[in-house]
Every structure is written in structure tokens, then in C-alpha cells.
From Swiss-Prot:
Species of the source: Alkaliphilus metalliredigens (strain QYMF)
Underlying gene: pnp3
Single GO term (MF): magnesium ion binding
Protein's UniProt name: Polyribonucleotide nucleotidyltransferase 3
Disulfide bonds: none
Gene3D superfamilies linked: GHMP Kinase, N-terminal domain, K Homology domain, type 1, Nucleic acid-binding proteins
Length: 702
């Protein structure tokens, strides 16, 4: 039986249908938000996967082009690999729900959200995120939700729930928040230098809306929800645990307190290997149990060391930033480079400038758009001393690249001020935590080295959290071990003026306003420290671009002149391109961008365009080319694409019988523009520039 539920969300109807489609899935729902329709399903395997020490959750977000009435391009004519937007949305679905499955639950769980119809003003990503919570909550899958999600914008200081596409253009904030009725679970934000207080107020505003949606979902579950499956978690053998603890004594604690990462890992591995060998000999076939106990003890010991003793794995204070060093201009042929080192994390970011035709065209189910500023993040296996197959960017790499891109976006100059396409690539060379925020810092240095006039410098910092009962410890600039064993990963990027990007993921059941407020203030202090260290290498963008970068010149012509510049079938513009070697981009408003390999080519191309759009002026003298000879005169091209007639009577003072007696096609002659008639036809004279012959009376008087 079909059940329909409805509430208002952002002033628009939000409708949930249960039992209409996909009934063989353990949980499913059809979300209708305006004209946006999203089908979300949740399925789980009947049996857990043996030998796993992680929860095998997969979330997929499918964009179907029929949702916006499009047929896929290319030869195959069907949707292929997910777009970057689809990958990022899949991550948004995954992150808030992952912490809410029972510990020890290792069944395969798959959530699939399929966009069936798309309304630009009703975001399908939010519909998919809420739908995933509903599908899991009404199913028999042991999900400890529900969660809910909203998007928040800010216009003139006012917060807006799920802003429309038009409102997003005017908004200084793009925030997505997920949470339960009691706590925040996930944050993704881009902002135009907002203060910590403004961001925090926006998060709390979002949480109030989340509470309403959660209550709505709880009502749905009370009516159509299925009983949850029982999770029988494998219990740790307490006797074996005691034996391992006694065997280790203080060895594990001493190994963890080794400050160098490589040496610490080696010491921990040595202690673990010793314990595994001992207990394998004592209890044959129980190595897996001993390994699980060791992993648990490493986590417990590290967290206890931080919370009780105030000692971090590398002996830093809780709010201390690792040593920072920076360098710019290290690759001779690159347009800009920045090398950023923070502790054992090292990122090299390279800037490449191109003409506007190098901008990325975005063609999905959203509005068609172009992206002239791009950031790509690469995390090769050697950065952590490992091996793995390299088969294109992972979801994590795409997500980190998008975060760094968002952090710098408000500082990128407009197309009018800097008419270039900009691509940044961050190569993580060594990683011990906070590589995405090191990429933010490296990108700032690289852009400035390339001469991109960014408005202000941007830096990023990753914050961590260890929460044991009522004891809360917030860590600045977390390293890899603290990230893996901690309860929160909060990334904050911004300038001296405010926050430009933020991302938060947690592994516990949520955090409150007090923790968020403390973490943001601690992040602000750390960010300002990092910005000051970055200024030791470069303080402002370089005045001149690299000699290897294209030279882009912007000129403005009247829109009516665009046709003349292009010419019939592109004849005129192609001639300029062929003669100068430049790339030329023309926009409908009359803006022309000339990208040249060198300054001389740029000058020639601009000069040719200016001649084309220049209007002939009566009384001006021009050097023109004879392009056609007739019985009654000659046609002379005085400007590119503009020709006039020199009548036979205006060729010379004396009588001319045949035009060919004076001129030949291809001759260059000087002419004076005498008139432009109402039909736009141009009258020229050669005679007006020739000296008048002496008269008979003048000759006799001499």
C-alpha cells in the first residue's frame, strides 16, 4: 500500500512516497521536491563479510540525463562514469550516515539515489541525502538514525533554507549541514570570508531545520518502519585481552610515545609482531583475535595519552602547529609553483595559465556552465610509503580537490580583471595528515608565484577531537595517527578576514555548539599563524607572468562589430589567427580575448582587430590596396573589410581615359575619404592628395 507524507521545506512542498516503487529493496522511498524527483533505495547483505575490520558501506548517486530532457552525447549515447558533482554528492550521502551503524556490523550495505526529474530550484542532492536517511530508517537495516540535511545560503545577513539557483548567485554562503535531532554530523561549506560567528550561527540555524525534518522522518518510521535486524557483535575474549595487556606491559605505550612517525610506526610494528608471535605459539589460530586486541589497545593508549597526560604522538602541545617551511618558483618551465611543508606533510602545487577556451565545460543535469578556475588533487601511494594501482582519481582525491578549489574561489580575480583559465594541481609528495589543507597553502603560494592577482592569501588547517565521556580535547593541525584514532576531522580554510571553506566529518554520534565554537576559534588562531609563515616566501602576487605563460589581451568592441571581426564563415578571424598564431575568443557582448605566444604576436593581432572595427572618418587619409578595377573607377580597401570607390574623375587632376593607365590591382595608394553616403557607400579621392598642376597665367607671370 502506498503511503504519502508531506512537509514544507524552504517554503516548498517536500513529499515522500513509500511503497510505490522498488518494493524488493529493504528500504526505499520516492522523494518529490518541487519538480525534482529522486528514488532512494537501501539494501544489505544477509550475512556479514568475514575477516573485515571496517564497515562495507557504499553510496551511489546517479544523474540520469532524461531528468532534464537531454540525450547523452558521444557515440555510446548512455550515461557512463559519474560526473564530479555526482561523486561529491555520493560522498555527502555517505559521510553523515556512516557513523550511525552499530559497532561490529559488517554486512554489505548499499544506498543508491537516482535522480529521475530535476528542478533547478529544488536541489536533488539534499533530496537524496534526506531520502537515504528515510530509506535506511524504514528498512530492517540496523541504522541508528534518522539524520536530515539542509542547504543554507546567506543574503544581506539573512539565512535561507535550500536557496534557489537565483538566490545562490547572490549568496555569500553555500553550506550543507547534516545531523540528528541532538547533534551535528557533517558540514560542507564555501563562504566569502565570513566570520566564525556567522558560520556558527548558520550551522545552528541549519540544525533547527534539521530537527523539524528528523521529527517528520520519525513520524514516517512510526507508520511504515520495519523491525530492525539484531546485530550480534563478536565479543572480545576478556581473558585473552588481560593476557595481552600483561604481556605488553609498558612496551606499547613507549612505542606510541616515539615522536618521529617512521620510527614510531616501526616500534609499534615491532611490539605487535612480538606479541603476535608469542600468542600464536601459545594459542595457535588466534592471531586475528590478538591483532584486533592490539589495534584496540593502540587506539585506547593514544587517546589516553592525549586526554589524560596532554601528550600528542609527536610531543606537541594541543594547539601547537608543526614546523612550516615554504618555497616558490622551483620549477623553471611551470607558470607558477608553491612547495608547502608542514611537519611530515609536503605538497607541491603547480599553476598553469591558459586562454579562456581552456575553461572546463560543465554539462550534466545542472545548468550548463564553464569553469575557468580548476583545482586537482593527487595522492600517490608513495606519499605514505605504500604501493597500490593508480587508476584515475579516487573519490577522496576528487573530494579533496573540490574542497581546495572552493577555499580559493572567492579570492580568484574575475574574468574581466584576469582573462585566463587557471588550473592548479596539488601533488602530495609526503603525507602525515592535513594534506588537503597543505594543498590550500601550496595553491596560494603557487598562484602568487604565477602572478595571479588573488585578493588575499588563503591558508588551511585541520582540527581534531578526542572525546572520552565528559572530557573533550581539541587538537590543532592533526597528523595522520590523530586523524585515524580521533573523533572528528574539521578542516577550515580562510584569509585574515574570514572563512572561505570548511568541512567536518565525525566518527561519534555528533557534537554540539560549544565544541564547534571552541574548535573554530582555535582554528582561526592557527590559520593566522600559518599565513604569517607563508609570507616568509612571498607577500604579494608577482607583477609579471612567466615568460612561458600565454599573453592574453582583452579588448572591447561594439557588439554590432562582432560580425565584422568574424567575417563570412569565419574568414576574417581565421585570417588573423593564421597570420599571428594567436587564439581568439569572442563573446556576444563585444569582449574579445587574444591569447598569444609572445608580446609581438599579441600586438599584431590586436592591431588587426582594431583596424577592422575602426569606423572610416570623412577627411582622413588612408593607405589602401586596389582590390578591383572597373571602367568607371577603382575599389580600394582602406580598412580590413571596408572598401570605397575612387571614381575615374578623382584619380588625377588631368583627364584619365582608362583607369589601368594609372592603377593596377594590388597597388598600394594613398586616398582621402571624401564622403559616406546615406547607404554607407564610401567615396574616395586620389586626386585630392596630388599637387595641383600650374595654370598658364602662373607660368606667364614667372
Amino acid at each position: 500500500m502506498v503511503k504519502t507524507f508531506e512537509m514544507k521545506l524552504g517554503g516548498r512542498p517536500f513529499v515522500v512516497e513509500i511503497g510505490k516503487v522498488a518494493e524488493l529493496a529493504q528500504g526505499s522511498c520516492m522523494i518529490k521536491y518541487g519538480d525534482t524527483t529522486v528514488l532512494v533505495t537501501a539494501c544489505a547483505s544477509k550475512e556479514p563479510k568475514e575477516g573485515l575490520d571496517f564497515f562495507p558501506l557504499s553510496c551511489d548517486y546517479e544523474e540520469k540525463l532524461y531528468a532534464v530532457g537531454k540525450i547523452p552525447g558521444g557515440f555510446i549515447k548512455r550515461e557512463s562514469r559519474p560526473s564530479e558533482k555526482a561523486t561529491l554528492t555520493a560522498r555527502l550521502i555517505d559521510r553523515p550516515i556512516r557513523p550511525l551503524f552499530p559497532k561490529g556490523y559488517h554486512n554489505d550495505v548499499q544506498v543508491i539515489a537516482t535522480v529521475l526529474s530535476m528542478d533547478q530550484d529544488c536541489p536533488p542532492d539534499i533530496s537524496a541525502m534526506i531520502g537515504s536517511s528515510i530509506a535506511l530508517s524504514v528498512s530492517n537495516i540496523p541504522f541508528m538514525g534518522p539524520t536530515a540535511s539542509v542547504s543554507v545560503g546567506m543574503i544581506d545577513g539573512e539565512y535561507i533554507v535550500n536557496p534557489t539557483s537565483k538566490q545562490k548567485e547572490d549568496s555569500t554562503l553555500e553550506l550543507i549541514v547534516s545531523g540528528t535531532k541532538n547533534a551535528i554530523m557533517m558540514i560542507e561549506a564555501g563562504a566569502n570570508e565570513l566570520t566564525e560567528a556567522q558560520i556558527l550561527d548558520a550551522i545552528m540555524f541549519a540544525h533547527e531545520e534539521i530537527k523539524k525534518i528528523v521529527a517528520f522522518i520519525e513520524n514516517i518510521v512510526s507508520e511504515v518502519g520495519k523491525p530492525k535486524s539484531e546485530v550480534i557483535a563478536k565479543q572480545m575474549d576478556s581473558n585473552l585481552l588481560t593476557e595481552v595487556v600483561i604481556f605488553l606491559d609498558t612496551k606499547l605505550a613507549n612505542a606510541i610515545k616515539t615522536f618521529d612517525k617512521t620510527e614510531r610506526n616501526e616500534n609499534i610494528q615491532a611490539v605487535s609482531a612480538e606479541a603476535l608471535d608469542y600468542f600464536e605459539e601459545k594459542y595457535e589460530g588466534r592471531s586475528k583475535e590478538v591483532h584486533d586486541i592490539l589495534s584496540m589497545l593502540i587506539k585506547v593508549e593514544t587517546r589516553k595519552m592525549i586526554t589524560s597526560e596532554g601528550i600528542r604522538p609527536d610531543n606537541r602541545k594541543l594547539d601547537e602547529i608543526r614546523p612550516i617551511s615554504t618555497q616558490v618558483g622551483i620549477l623553471p618551465r611551470a607558470h607558477g609553483t608553491g612547495l608547502f611543508n608542514r611537519g611530515e606533510t609536503q605538497v607541491l602545487t603547480i599553476t598553469t595559465l591558459g586562454d579562456l577556451r581552456d575553461a572546463q565545460r560543465i554539462d550534466g543535469i545542472g545548468e550548463e556552465d564553464e569553469k575557468r578556475y580548476m583545482h586537482h588533487y593527487n595522492f600517490p601511494p608513495y606519499s605514505v610509503g605504500e604501493t597500490r594501482f593508480m587508476r584515475g582519481p579516487s573519490r577522496r582525491e576528487i573530494g579533496h580537490g573540490a574542497l581546495v578549489e572552493r577555499a580559493l574561489l572567492p579570492m580568484i580575480p574575475s574574468k574581466e580583471d584576469f582573462p585566463y583559465a587557471i588550473r592548479l594541481v596539488s601533488e602530495v609528495l609526503t603525507c602525515n595528515g592535513s594534506s588537503s589543507q597543505a594543498s590550500v597553502c601550496g595553491s596560494t603560494l603557487s598562484l602568487m608565484d604565477a602572478g595571479v592577482p588573488i585578493k588575499r592569501m588563503v591558508a588551511g588547517i585541520a582540527m581534531g577531537l578526542i572525546k572520552e565521556d565528559d572530557q573533550v580535547v581539541i587538537l590543532s593541525d592533526i597528523q595522520g595517527m590523530e586523524d585515524a584514532l580521533g573523533d572528528m576531522d574539521l578542516k577550515v580554510a580562510g584569509t585574515e578576514e574570514g572563512i572561505t571553506a570548511m568541512q567536518m566529518d565525525i566518527k561519534i554520534a555528533g557534537i554540539d555548539r560549544g565544541i564547534m565554537e571552541t574548535a573554530l576559534e582555535q582554528a582561526r588562531i592557527g590559520r593566522l599563524h600559518i599565513l604569517n609563515k607563508m609570507k616568509e616566501s612571498i607577500t604579494s602576487p608577482r607583477i609579471e607572468l612567466s615568460s612561458y605563460a600565454p599573453k592574453v589581451t582583452q579588448i572591447k568592441v561594439h557588439p554590432d562589430k562582432v560580425r565584422e571581426v568574424i567575417g563570412a564563415g569565419g574568414k576574417v578571424i581565421n585570417k588573423i589567427i593564421d597570420e599571428t598564431g594567436c587564439k581568439i575568443t569572442i563573446e556576444n557582448d563585444g569582449t574579445i580575448y587574444v591569447a598569444a605566444p609572445d608580446q609581438e604576436s599579441s600586438r599584431r593581432a590586436v592591431e588587426m582587430i582594431e583596424l577592422i572595427v575602426k569606423d572610416p572618418v570623412v577627411g582622413e587619409v588612408y593607405t589602401g590596396k586596389v582590390i578591383k578595377i572597373m571602367d568607371f573607377g577603382a575599389f580600394v580597401e582602406i580598412l580590413p573589410g571596408k572598401e570605397g570607390l575612387v571614381h575615374i574623375s578623382n584619380l588625377a587632376h588631368e583627364r584619365v581615359t582608362k583607369v589601368t593607365d594609372v592603377l593596377a590591382e594590388g597597388d598600394l595608394i594613398e586616398v582621402k575619404l571624401m564622403e559616406i553616403n546615406p547607404q554607407g557607400k564610401i567615396g574616395l579621392s586620389r586626386k585630392a592628395l596630388l599637387p595641383k598642376p600650374e595654370t598658364k597665367s602662373e607660368t606667364q607671370s614667372e
